[in-house]
C-alpha cells in the first residue's frame, strides 16, 4: 500500500487532480466507521457529517460527505437556499438518480453502493458511483468569478455490451433556511437550542412558492412571504433581523431539453426516502401546482447510450440577484459549457499568494489550498453593496451572526498582495458600519442590522487602521483614501457621505479620545478587547460596568504601538505631517506605559479596577506579548527572557501551536484548555509567528508549521476537521480533548450536571456543530509568509529581512516576489502606481560579504552597502514591476 501524502489524516488522502491542483480524496465510510463520529448537537447536524466548501465570489456551497450541497447566499439575509430537513423530505440538492428501468444508481451516499468515490477539490465536489455495469461521474462546481450559480456536470457511462435507455433525474430543493440570529437569541434565552432551527423553519414555511417553466430546459422558482407579492417592491432598504424577500432560484439543463419535471419534493421521495424515492418508479408528473413546503426542483433527461458509450449532461442551479435576468447569468455557460470546469480550475491558479520550498512539497499544496478556501468563502451583502468574508464557522452557520468586525479585516490581509479589489471592498464594508462618533460596532446580523448586544470591544478601530495602512503602503493606492462612501445607516433621511480618509481619522479619534487611556496610561479595555472572555468570562457580573469604565488592556496598548506607527506612515505618504506628529506622540506614550508593566518575565495582560487589580502577573497570557515585540516595546535584554517563557510555558508541549495561557484559570466558566481558558487560536498564533520572525527564525518557522492543517492532521489523524479546514480554536494540551475543538461533555455523558454547564455558557453551542470554514486558520498562514521572508513596506519602498531557514525557496504574488537560491536573492515589486522605490535587504554580515553583483530591471548596478544592508533604488511602471537580483558571482 502506497504511503499517503504528508498531512492526509485518517479519512482519505491528499492528491493532485487533473488540473495540477491539490484535492482531498475522501475514503471514509462515515455510516459504518465509528471514527467519523464527533460529539455535537444532533438536532442541528448529523454527528457523521463532514463538510467541504465549494464557492466563488458570490456564493458558498456547503458540500456534505453524504453527497448533497447546500447553497449559502447572503443578499437579503444570510441563508441556505435549499434546506436539509429529512423529516420533511427536504434533502438540499446536488445529487441525482440514474435509472435503467430495473436498477438505480444515486449520487447521494447511502453506504450501499458497489463503489462510491468522493473528492473534495478546489471549487468542486466530485462523486463517482459505479454499479450494475453503469457509472455516474458527477461534479458540482462553483464557476470561478462572481456568478450566482453552481454547475452540475454529470457524465454517464454504459459499461455493458448492450445499448441502454436511461433516465437521469436531477434534484435541488428550494425551501430556504435563513440564519436568523433572532431565532438563535430566542432559543438561547429559552435554554433550548433545538428551538432555533424550529423557529427558522417556521419562518421559511410562511413563504409560498410559484414555479414557471424556462422553455423546455428547466424551472424558475419565486418565493413570496405569506403570498404577498408586493413585499419585493420596497425601494428604500431598511435594516432587518429577518428578510421577507428571497431571490428567485432556477434549475436549468444547459445542453438538452428536459423530458419531465416535478415541483413536489415531498411526494417524489415519498415513503422510499432519499435512498429509493417513490418518484423514480414512474414518470415525473410535470405539473407546477406545488406552492408550500413540499416544493423542490426536479428535472429529468433521457439518455440513449450505445455499448461502452458515455455522455455528459450539464445543469445550472442558482439564484437571480435583484435586477439580474436569467439570460444574463446563463449566456456564457450555454456557449462553452464543456470547458467551464477546466477554465474555472485554471483560474484558481491566478492572482494568489504562493510559497514553494525545496523538499517540502506539502507547503506549496497547503498554501494553494488556503488561497482557495479563503476566497471561496466570499459572499455579497446587498445592504452594504459590498462583498464580505465573514468568519463563517459556528458564528455564521449556527448562530447567524457576522462577528466581529476585526475578523473580515484579518481575512483580507493576504489579499493585499494579490487582489486589491477585495481588500477595498471589505474596508468599505466596515467603514459603512461606523457610527457617528467613530465607533465600529461589534458585528452585523440579518440584513444591515447592527448587532443589538451590550458588548463594546475596544480594539476594533485598530484593525481598520492597521489593514488600511498596510494596504496603502503596499500598493501606493492613495486615491482610495479620497473615495466617497455612504455612512450608516446608508439610506433614507439619515444617510450621509464621507471619504475613506475622513472615516479613518474619525475612528482614530474615537480610539484615542473616547476610548482613550486609563490611570496607568494604557488603552482602556471597555467590555473586552480581542478576547471576549477577558471581561465577560473573568469578571463577576456585578463588576462589569466598573471594569468597562476603568479597565485597561495591555493587548490593545501593545497592538496600538505598532498600528499607529503604520498609520503615521500612511499620513506621511499623503503629507499630513501635523497629524503624523500627533499619532507618533500618542504611540510613544503608550510604549512608555507598556514598559512599566514588564514584570521581569513577561508583560501583564490587563488592569480591571482597584478591587480586582491586574491579571497576567502570575499567569502568562500570550495575546499582548507578540505585539510588544512587533511594536519594538521590549528592551533588548528582556527579549531572551520573554521568548524563553513563551517557548517553555506555551509552545513546547503543543504539537499544533502555542496555547493562550500558561495554565488554566479557575474563575473562567470554560473548561481548562478550551477556548479563552488556554485554548489554541490561529489568529493569535499568527501574531506570534510574526513576532518570532523578528527575533528567532527557527522558532518562527517551527510555529508556522505547527499551525498548519498538515501538522494538525499528523498529530491528530482521527479528527476529521483540521485536515482540509478547521475552527477558530483548538483545545490545547491542558484539555483532555487535546486537538479537538470545543464541545459540551453533556453530548458524551448525558449527565444533568453537564447539561447545566452547557446552559450557563455564554454561547450555548458546540464549536463541533460546524467545526470548519472558519477563515483564520486559512488567512494567517498565508499572511505569515510575508514575515518568513521578512518583507516590510515603508514610506519609501520595501525592506526585506529574510529569516526562513531554508537554502532555497520562492515566494510569489502579483504585488511582490522574493526568491532565494544558492546563487543569491531576487524579487519584484509591482505596486498599483508608477514610481521609484527604495529596496533594502538586511542580511547577516558574513552573507553580505559574498554578494558582488546587482541587477535592477535587467541592468547591472554597483552594490551599495550601508552597515548590514544592501540598499538600492529602482522604478516600477504600469504592468512592468521593479525587478532585481543580487548574486554571489
Q: Where do the protein language model's features map onto the residues?
A:
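An extended acidic
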Residues: 7-15, 55, 60-130, 223-280, ...
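Non-catalytic C-terminal accessory modules of carbohydrate-active enzymes
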Residues: 71-130, 134-135, 674, 687-889
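Extended, loop-rich substrate-binding clefts of extracytoplasmic carbohydrate-active enzymes
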Residues: 100-149, 274-299, 368-372
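Polysaccharide-binding surfaces and accessory modules of carbohydrate-active proteins
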Residues: 143-146, 150-280, 331-349, 723
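Catalytic cores of carbohydrate-active enzymes
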Residues: 169-171, 441-442, 559-667, 705, ...
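Acidic/polar, glycine-enriched structural segments that form the non-catalytic walls/loops
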Residues: 177-178, 196, 207, 212, ...
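Active-site acid/base region of carbohydrate-active enzymes
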Residues: 358-376, 383, 418-421, 430-439, ...
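Aromatic-rich carbohydrate-recognition surfaces in CAZymes
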Residues: 401-408, 412-523, 554-557, 561, ...
Amino acid at each position: 500500500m502506497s504511503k499517503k501524502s504528508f498531512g492526509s489524516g485518517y479519512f482519505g488522502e491528499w492528491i493532485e487532480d487533473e488540473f495540477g491542483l491539490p484535492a482531498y480524496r475522501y475514503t471514509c465510510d462515515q455510516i459504518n466507521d465509528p471514527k467519523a463520529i464527533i460529539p455535537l448537537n444532533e438536532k442541528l447536524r448529523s454527528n457523521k457529517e463532514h463538510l467541504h466548501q465549494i464557492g466563488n465570489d458570490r456564493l458558498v456551497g456547503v458540500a456534505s460527505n453524504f453527497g448533497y450541497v447546500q447553497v449559502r447566499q447572503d443578499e437579503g439575509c444570510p441563508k441556505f437556499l435549499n434546506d436539509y430537513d429529512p423529516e420533511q423530505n427536504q434533502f438540499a440538492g446536488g445529487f441525482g438518480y440514474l435509472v435503467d428501468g430495473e436498477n438505480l444508481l444515486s449520487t447521494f451516499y447511502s453506504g450501499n453502493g458497489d463503489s462510491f468515490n468522493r473528492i473534495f477539490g478546489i471549487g468542486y465536489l466530485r462523486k463517482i458511483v459505479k454499479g450494475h455495469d453503469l457509472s455516474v461521474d458527477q461534479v458540482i462546481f462553483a464557476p470561478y468569478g462572481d456568478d450566482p450559480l453552481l454547475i452540475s456536470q454529470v457524465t454517464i457511462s454504459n459499461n455493458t455490451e448492450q445499448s441502454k435507455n436511461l433516465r437521469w433525474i436531477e434534484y435541488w430543493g428550494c425551501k430556504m433556511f435563513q440564519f436568523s440570529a433572532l431565532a438563535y437569541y430566542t432559543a438561547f434565552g429559552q435554554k433550548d437550542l433545538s428551538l432555533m432551527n424550529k423557529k427558522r423553519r417556521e419562518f421559511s414555511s410562511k413563504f409560498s412558492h410559484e414555479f414557471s417553466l424556462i422553455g423546455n430546459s428547466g424551472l424558475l422558482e419565486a418565493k413570496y412571504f405569506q403570498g404577498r407579492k408586493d413585499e419585493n417592491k420596497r425601494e428604500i432598504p431598511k435594516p432587518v433581523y429577518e428578510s421577507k424577500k428571497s431571490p428567485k432560484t432556477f434549475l436549468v439543463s444547459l445542453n438538452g431539453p428536459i423530458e419531465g419535471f416535478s415541483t413536489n419534493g415531498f411526494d417524489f421521495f415519498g415513503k422510499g426516502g432519499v435512498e429509493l424515492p417513490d418518484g423514480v418508479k414512474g414518470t415525473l408528473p410535470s405539473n407546477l401546482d406545488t406552492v408550500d413546503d413540499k416544493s423542490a426542483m426536479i428535472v429529468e433527461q433521457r439518455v440513449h447510450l450505445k455499448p461502452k458509450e458515455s455522455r455528459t449532461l450539464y445543469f445550472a442551479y442558482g439564484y437571480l440577484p435583484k435586477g439580474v435576468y436569467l439570460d444574463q447569468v446563463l449566456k456564457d455557460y450555454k456557449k462553452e459549457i464543456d470547458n467551464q470546469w477546466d477554465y474555472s480550475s485554471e483560474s484558481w491558479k491566478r492572482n494568489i499568494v504562493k510559497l514553494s520550498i525545496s523538499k517540502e512539497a506539502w507547503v506549496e499544496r497547503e498554501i494553494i489550498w488556503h488561497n482557495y478556501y479563503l476566497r471561496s468563502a466570499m459572499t455579497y451583502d446587498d445592504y452594504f453593496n459590498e462583498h464580505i468574508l465573514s468568519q463563517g464557522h459556528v458564528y455564521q452557520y449556527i448562530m447567524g451572526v457576522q462577528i466581529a468586525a476585526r475578523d473580515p479585516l484579518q481575512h483580507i490581509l493576504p489579499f493585499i498582495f494579490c487582489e486589491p479589489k477585495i481588500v477595498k471592498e471589505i474596508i468599505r464594508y466596515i467603514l459603512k458600519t461606523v457610527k457617528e462618533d467613530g465607533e465600529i460596532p461589534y458585528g452585523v446580523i440579518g440584513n444591515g442590522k447592527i448587532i443589538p448586544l451590550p458588548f463594546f470591544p475596544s480594539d476594533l478601530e485598530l484593525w481598520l487602521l492597521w489593514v488600511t495602512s498596510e494596504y496603502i503602503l503596499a500598493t501606493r493606492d492613495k486615491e482610495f483614501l479620497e473615495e466617497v462612501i455612504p455612512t450608516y445607516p446608508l439610506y433614507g433621511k439619515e444617510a450621509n457621505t464621507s471619504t475613506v480618509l475622513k472615516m479613518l481619522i474619525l475612528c482614530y479619534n474615537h480610539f484615542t479620545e473616547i476610548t482613550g487611556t486609563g490611570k496607568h496610561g494604557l488603552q482602556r479595555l471597555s467590555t473586552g478587547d480581542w478576547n471576549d472572555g477577558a471581561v465577560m468570562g473573568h469578571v463577576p457580573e456585578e463588576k462589569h460596568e466598573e471594569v468597562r469604565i476603568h479597565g485597561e488592556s495591555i493587548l490593545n496598548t501593545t497592538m496600538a504601538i505598532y498600528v499607529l506607527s503604520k498609520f503615521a506612515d500612511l499620513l506621511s505618504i499623503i503629507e499630513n505631517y501635523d497629524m503624523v506628529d500627533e499619532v507618533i506622540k500618542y504611540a510613544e506614550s503608550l510604549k512608555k506605559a507598556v514598559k512599566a508593566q514588564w514584570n521581569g518575565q513577561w508583560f501583564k495582560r490587563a488592569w480591571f479596577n482597584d478591587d480586582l487589580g491586574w491579571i497576567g502577573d502570575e499567569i502568562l497570557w500570550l495575546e499582548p506579548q507578540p505585539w510588544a515585540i512587533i511594536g519594538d516595546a521590549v528592551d533588548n535584554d528582556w527579549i531572551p527572557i520573554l521568548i524563553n517563557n513563551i517557548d517553555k510555558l506555551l509552545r513546547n508541549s503543543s504539537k499544533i501551536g502555542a496555547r493562550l495561557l500558561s495554565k488554566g484559570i479557575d474563575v473562567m466558566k470554560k473548561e481548562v484548555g478550551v477556548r479563552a481558558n488556554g485554548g489554541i487560536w490561529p489568529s493569535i498564533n499568527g501574531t506570534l509567528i510574526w513576532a518570532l520572525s523578528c527575533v528567532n527564525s527557527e522558532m518562527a518557522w517551527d510555529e508556522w508549521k505547527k499551525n498548519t492543517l498538515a501538522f494538525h492532521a499528523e498529530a491528530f489523524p482521527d479528527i476529521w476537521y483540521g485536515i482540509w479546514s478547521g475552527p477558530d480554536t483548538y483545545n490545547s494540551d491542558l484539555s483532555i480533548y487535546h486537538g479537538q475543538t470545543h464541545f459540551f461533555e453533556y453530548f458524551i455523558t448525558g449527565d444533568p450536571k453537564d447539561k447545566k454547564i452547557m446552559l450557563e455558557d455564554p454561547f450555548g453551542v458546540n464549536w463541533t456543530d460546524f467545526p470548519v470554514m472558519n477563515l483564520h486558520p486559512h488567512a494567517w498562514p498565508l499572511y505569515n509568509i510575508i514575515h518568513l521572508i521578512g518583507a516590510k513596506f515603508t514610506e519609501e519602498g520595501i525592506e526585506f529581512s529574510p529569516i526562513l531557514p531554508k537554502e532555497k525557496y520562492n515566494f510569489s504574488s502579483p504585488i511582490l516576489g522574493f526568491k532565494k537560491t544558492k546563487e543569491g536573492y531576487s524579487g519584484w515589486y509591482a505596486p498599483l502606481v508608477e514610481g521609484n522605490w527604495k529596496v533594502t535587504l538586511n542580511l547577516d554580515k558574513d552573507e553580505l560579504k559574498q554578494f558582488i553583483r546587482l541587477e535592477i530591471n535587467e541592468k547591472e548596478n554597483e552594490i551599495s552597502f550601508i552597515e548590514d544592508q544592501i540598499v538600492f533604488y529602482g522604478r516600477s511602471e504600469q504592468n512592468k514591476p521593479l525587478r532585481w537580483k543580487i548574486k554571489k558571482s
